[in-house]
């Protein structure tokens, strides 16, 4: 059905839907826009809608808003104009017909409830669909947009009206007045009306269905942005106390400690007080202002990637569990800030009990932190209360965040995962909840980590300083230029899908009352944890600092001319761009020269100038600290570095022999650095890397052999140096195993560390993780898994010597002699 233009123009004029540039509506909107421009400072989600959502501005675009609000419409208009999107107040002209560029799904409430305007959305949808019927080349992009002023979820008690209600004019005025600077314009992926018309038709029932689906979309979107209501804290405690698991634990506590039931119950309440968050939207708003100021002053930018996939999961009703790597105490604040600005609910965060000091503890608690002790051993009541609290968060639909590494990485590499909280997450699923739980791995990276100096001291044996107010103030006083931050969301892991694939009968273990530990739980949790670490590394972010540190630390003198550094960075960048580590990893778009200029602004390097040019130097006192940043991306370059080391040593080598060498060493590298490839994927990866190294001129390919190219030998040697220290560590352990096949695990780890420390001193190895206990412990476990150490604990001497000989070829002769002489007690 179509309307003549005069009738339509009259209808649009009476509803105020006419062009912004004509008649009294122009005056009306200008007058309304004046206070809004002062009161409202909205943010767009996503930050750049057109490219991030794939909008084609050369094709018609119409906007769909949830309900009639001129304030929302003008707020949308401001964001559209700021991002070069069509003005929603300019009508669309299609085949001589003028149509509004925006549609309100619902007329919205009024101050005077007896006045209910006729809804126009169905009629307008039908008009648009009808035009697609008559014009087969037409394809209008329908973009759902919601404008939110404030995102308080409200409390379960004490509110007559639900927090997601539509506002009438007076309510909207006060919302804009109070929350105008806490407003978001959320653009959703577009819907093709051409596809709708082709697949479903163009009659009025389809228009009605479109309006109904749009209503559901906006309701889900607001719930994803605001979250479920918050409980009164005491009501939550009462519910937990009434649970069968805690009631039984209280009885056991009273019996084992020979105390009264009331005293045991008080102990349980005290633990709840210690653990539970006290979420406050007003604290979120205040902290958002402070953090916004902090990021703008000290950081040069926060780079966020792949957030749309998380927004979609939240929109689809998934229970989100954020699992980031842990670099710094700043992670807590940065991730909550990023999620809030991506239109998502800040999560409840599992924080170490060491952060529960005044004033940080109460502040973190109001920002959603719940506190967890380092160990649950020996305290059944505590473990039960914590598990029930975590399960209650899941059952109520709150997003949760925890650091699967258990603590901050002191080396810049991922730590082996701690699986306790992850195990409780799966146990929560076994209560039979209806919402699917999805784990979101997250890579967090920085160009400057405030605690990196402290980490280096701790790795050298210093006692960890207890977190306190003075320590926090000292840290804040050192804030300077922190460069850029990176938050990359990795590939989500839907737990239900994972369990269906790997434990098909997992539903048989569901118990809505008791926490269960089926036989499959521990191995499954371990596999999930390892997979999560791989997915975190898959989302790695290369940046100016970690690339420059990688190159300078590869140089034995920790210095390169600017030309050499530029050439080396180009090598790294081309490898990462042309043979990406994964589809989720990110590489700077800037040139090598621009990255060097940026890194020099961080004041970590020195520059000496002479008549020939600049020499960029990494000072000795900074070298140990800079290994942290190199290690952030070690996994992204270790395979090409290993290939370069093998080719450099042999001068020329066939692809098959190269593949054999890599295949021997890869299991250790995969376990240590959580690499993404399985063994059967290596041939294709090595071929791709070899072709890229040939393209760069680092090697030549002749008759299926890789030959070193003397013209670029320095670049190849610096690339090879990225694997140097790792290969030296492996050589230490394999030599010790070969020399003493019956050595026990503890002694092997201890002696490996002793030799590594000796090597570090004698050969100027600056990396603290070179003799880190955890690294050698992980290596020895991998050797057992790979069969180098038998079930009885003895090594297989023939196999270990074979691997040592391979490694001995890849390390320098002086390092090899130091390793071999150390076991003989020689100097």
From Swiss-Prot:
Among InterPro entries, the record links this protein to:
GPAT/DHAPAT, GPAT/DHAPAT_C, GPAT/DHAPAT_LPLAT, GPAT_PlsB, Plipid/glycerol_acylTrfase
**Which GO annotations describe the biological process of this protein?**
CDP-diacylglycerol biosynthetic process; fatty acid metabolic process
Q: What does the UniProt entry say about where the protein is found?
A: Cell inner membrane
Write the Enzyme Commission number(s) for this entry: 2.3.1.15
Group of enzyme by EC: transferase
Any one GO CC term of this protein is: plasma membrane
The pathway noted for it is: Phospholipid metabolism; CDP-diacylglycerol biosynthesis; CDP-diacylglycerol from sn-glycerol 3-phosphate: step 1/3
Q: Which residues form a coiled coil?
A: none
GO molecular function annotations of the record: glycerol-3-phosphate O-acyltransferase activity
Q: Sorted alphabetically, which keywords does the UniProt record give?
A: Acyltransferase, Cell inner membrane, Cell membrane, Lipid biosynthesis, Lipid metabolism, Membrane, Phospholipid biosynthesis, Phospholipid metabolism, Transferase
Q: What is this enzyme's catalytic activity, as reactions?
A: sn-glycerol 3-phosphate + an acyl-CoA = a 1-acyl-sn-glycero-3-phosphate + CoA
Q: Where is this motif: HXXXXD motif?
A: 326-331
Can the keyword Cell membrane be found in this entry's annotation? yes
Q: How does it sit in the membrane?
A: Peripheral membrane protein
Similarity field: Belongs to the GPAT/DAPAT family.
Domain remarks in the Swiss-Prot or TrEMBL record: The HXXXXD motif is essential for acyltransferase activity and may constitute the binding site for the phosphate moiety of the glycerol-3-phosphate.
What this protein is called in its record is Glycerol-3-phosphate acyltransferase
- What is the scientific name of the source organism? Shigella flexneri
Taxon lineage: Bacteria, Pseudomonadati, Pseudomonadota, Gammaproteobacteria, Enterobacterales
């Amino acid at each position: 059905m179509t309307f003549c233009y005069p009738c339509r123009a009259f209808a649009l004029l009476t509803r105020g839907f006419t062009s912004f540039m004509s008649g009294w509506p122009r005056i009306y909107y200008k007058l309304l826009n004046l206070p809004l421009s002062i009161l409202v400072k909205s943010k767009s989600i996503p930050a750049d809608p057109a490219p991030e959502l794939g909008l084609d501005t050369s094709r018609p675009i119409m906007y769909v808003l949830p309900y009639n609000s001129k304030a929302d419409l003008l707020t949308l208009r401001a964001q559209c104009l700021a991002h070069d999107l069509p003005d929603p107040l300019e009508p669309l002209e299609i085949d001589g017909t003028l149509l509004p560029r925006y549609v309100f799904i619902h007329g919205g409430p009024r101050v005077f409830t007896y006045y209910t305007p006729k809804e126009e959305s169905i009629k307008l949808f039908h008009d648009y669909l009808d035009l697609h019927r008559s014009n087969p080349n037409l394809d209008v992009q329908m973009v759902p947009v919601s404008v939110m002023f404030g995102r308080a979820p409200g409390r379960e008690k004490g509110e007559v009206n639900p927090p997601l209600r539509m506002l009438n004019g007076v309510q909207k005025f006060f919302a804009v007045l109070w929350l105008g600077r806490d407003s978001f314009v959320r653009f959703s992926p577009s819907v093709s009306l051409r596809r709708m018309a082709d697949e479903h038709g163009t009659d009025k029932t389809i228009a009605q269905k479109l309006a109904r689906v749009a209503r559901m979309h906006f309701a889900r979107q607001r719930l994803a942005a605001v979250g479920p209501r918050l409980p009164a804290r005491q009501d939550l405690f009462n519910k937990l106390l009434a649970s069968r698991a805690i009631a039984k634990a209280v009885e056991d506590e009273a019996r084992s400690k020979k105390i009264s039931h009331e005293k045991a119950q008080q102990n349980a309440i005290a633990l709840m007080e210690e653990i539970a968050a006290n979420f406050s939207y007003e604290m979120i708003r205040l902290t958002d202002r402070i953090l916004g100021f902090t990021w703008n002053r000290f950081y040069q930018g926060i780079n966020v990637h792949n957030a749309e996939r998380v927004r979609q999961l939240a929109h689809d009703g998934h229970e989100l569990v954020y699992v980031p790597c842990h670099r710094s105490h700043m992670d807590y604040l940065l991730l909550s800030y990023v999620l809030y600005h991506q239109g998502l609910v800040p999560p409840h965060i599992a924080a170490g009990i060491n952060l529960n000091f005044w004033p940080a503890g109460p502040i973190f608690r109001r920002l959603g932190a719940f506190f967890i002790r380092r160990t649950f051993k020996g305290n059944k009541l505590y473990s039960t209360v914590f598990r029930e609290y975590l399960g209650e968060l899941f059952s109520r639909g709150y997003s949760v965040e925890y650091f699967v590494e258990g603590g901050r990485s002191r080396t810049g590499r991922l730590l082996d995962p701690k699986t306790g909280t992850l195990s409780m997450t799966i146990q929560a699923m076994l209560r039979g909840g209806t919402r699917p739980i999805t784990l979101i791995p997250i890579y967090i990276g920085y160009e400057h980590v405030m605690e990196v100096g402290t980490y280096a001291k701790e790795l050298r044996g210093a006692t960890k300083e207890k977190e306190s107010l003075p320590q926090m103030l000292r840290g804040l006083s050192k804030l300077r230029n922190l460069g850029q931050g990176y938050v990359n969301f990795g590939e989500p892991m839907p737990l239900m899908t994972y369990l269906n694939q790997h434990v098909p009968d997992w539903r048989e273990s569901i118990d809505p009352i008791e926490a269960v530990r089926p036989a499959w739980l521990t191995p499954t949790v371990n596999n999930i944890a390892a997979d999560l670490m791989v997915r975190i590394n898959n989302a790695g972010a290369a940046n100016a600092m970690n690339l420059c540190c990688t190159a300078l630390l590869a140089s034995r003198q920790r210095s390169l001319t600017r030309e050499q550094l530029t050439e080396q960075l180009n090598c790294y960048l081309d490898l990462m761009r042309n043979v990406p580590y994964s589809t989720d990893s990110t590489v700077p778009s800037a040139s090598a020269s621009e990255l060097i200029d940026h890194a020099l602004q961080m004041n970590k390097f020195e520059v000496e100038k002479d008549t020939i040019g600049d020499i960029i130097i990494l000072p000795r006192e900074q070298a140990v600290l800079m290994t942290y940043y190199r290690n952030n991306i070690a996994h992204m370059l270790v395979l090409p570095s290993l290939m370069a080391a093998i080719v450099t040593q042999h001068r020329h080598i066939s692809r098959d022999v190269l593949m054999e060498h890599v295949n021997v060493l890869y299991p250790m590298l995969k376990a240590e650095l959580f690499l993404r490839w399985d063994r059967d994927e290596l041939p294709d990866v090595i071929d791709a890397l070899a072709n890229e190294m040939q393209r760069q001129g680092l090697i030549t390919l002749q008759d299926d052999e890789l030959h070193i190219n003397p013209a670029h030998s320095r670049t190849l040697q610096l690339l090879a140096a990225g694997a140097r220290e790792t290969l030296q560590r492996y050589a230490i352990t394999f030599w010790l195993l070969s020399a003493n096949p019956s050595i026990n695990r503890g002694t092997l780890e201890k002696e490996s560390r002793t030799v590594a420390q000796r090597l570090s001193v004698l050969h100027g190895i600056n990396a603290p993780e070179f003799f880190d206990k955890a690294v050698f412990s992980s290596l020895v476990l991998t050797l057992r898994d790979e069969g180098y150490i038998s079930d009885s604990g003895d090594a297989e001497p023939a196999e270990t010597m074979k691997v040592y000989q391979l490694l001995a070829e890849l390390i320098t002769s002086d390092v090899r002699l130091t390793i071999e002489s150390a076991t003989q007690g020689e100097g």
